[in-house]
A protein has these predicted regions:
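Glycine/small-residue-rich phosphate/adenosyl-binding loop
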Residues: 1-46
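Arginine/glycine-rich "motif VI" loop of SF2 helicases in the C-terminal RecA-like domain
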Residues: 21, 59, 82-83
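Conserved residues at the C-terminal ends of beta-strands
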Residues: 32, 68, 93
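A short, structure-level motif marking secondary-structure boundaries and short turns
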Residues: 37-40, 88-89, 101
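Short proline/glycine-enriched turn/loop segments at secondary-structure junctions
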Residues: 77-82, 103-106
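C-terminal helix-cap and adjacent tail motif
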Residues: 90-121
Length: 121
């Protein structure tokens, strides 16, 4: 689900000590899931969704940051989630204020061939 209301974003920023960036975002996506049955599978699936969403946002020049949700009861109240659902992660989105988000043109790193081994070490 997507939150864009400034008051709601400010409230959501308090569900975890590292979620302060949510308050200043243009929008925040709440990844909502069924109350976990298989937590490892859920964490994997939501992790994949999170990284793909963040990569797609970067490709569009949109900055993003993720946050955990520590206070589930508070998040459920803020988002008005039905029984059996919980908010797993928050992903804040927005355009950088100081500069356009651009990929590194000349990354300062070793060549791919120097760090990847093929078939054996």
């Amino acid at each position: 689900m997507v939150a864009t209301d400034r008051d709601q974003l400010t409230e959501l920023s308090t569900v975890w000590r590292g979620a302060g960036h949510v308050a200043g975002s243009a929008a925040t996506i709440a990844l909502v899931a069924d109350v976990p049955g298989n937590e490892r599978r859920l964490a994997y699936d939501l992790g994949q969704a999170t990284v793909n969403l963040m990569l797609a946002a970067a490709d569009l020049g949109i900055g993003s940051s993720h946050a955990n949700v520590e206070d589930q009861e508070k998040a459920r109240r803020i988002l008005d989630l039905p029984a059996g659902k919980h908010c797993a992660y928050l992903i804040s989105l927005g355009y950088p204020a100081d500069r356009p988000l651009e990929p590194l043109r000349r990354p300062n790193r070793r060549a791919f061939e120097d760090v990847v081994h093929r078939g054996r070490w």
